[in-house]
């Protein structure tokens, strides 16, 4: 149950492709992330696709903003040994950063959510899997992409489901929603 959320909007150019718009999105992201990291607040970042999730997570990891946490070292090593030594997710997990999307193995997806809920991961970059039966909440929700898939814009219902993951009852009484772009207009049933 959402208690209260502060919404803050950040400009993203309306024309152009994702590469052009990502200049604005990344500027916005790296404007707010240092404060969030300093306050050690749980944060979820919504992106429209598994590919975008991996790219945004890699940008955060490469920024050097996150210190090594030494909490998930065993998991990181296991991922490197089991999947690939250079898997960015394996390295990110050691810094309290991970991603979540429907293409991950189910057991790994569940473990990532569990670690996030236990605050062993501080930043979770994810797709709409966040609103599809994943039980988690965060102090901050960053809506990086304003589309659900491809170019299909978020509708008001989906936007509210995603932003509603911030500021949950008995955990974070006031959440923060950072929106890169504009809030979708509500669709009235009449």
Question: In which residue ranges do the predicted regions lie?
Answer:
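Glycine-centered flexibility sites
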Residues: 96, 102, 119, 133, ...
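Post-DEXD/H (motif II) to motif III coupling segment of the RecA-like Helicase ATP-binding lobe
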Residues: 1-3
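Conserved segment of the helicase C-terminal RecA-like domain
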Residues: 140, 146-190
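Conserved nucleotide-binding/hydrolysis micro-motifs of P-loop NTPases
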Residues: 49-53, 105, 130-132, 147-149, ...
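SF2 helicase motor core recognition
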Residues: 109-114, 124-141, 164-173
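Conserved C-terminal RecA-like helicase domain
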Residues: 13-16, 20-125, 148-160
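A short acidic (Asp/Glu
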Residues: 54-58, 134-138, 153, 188-189
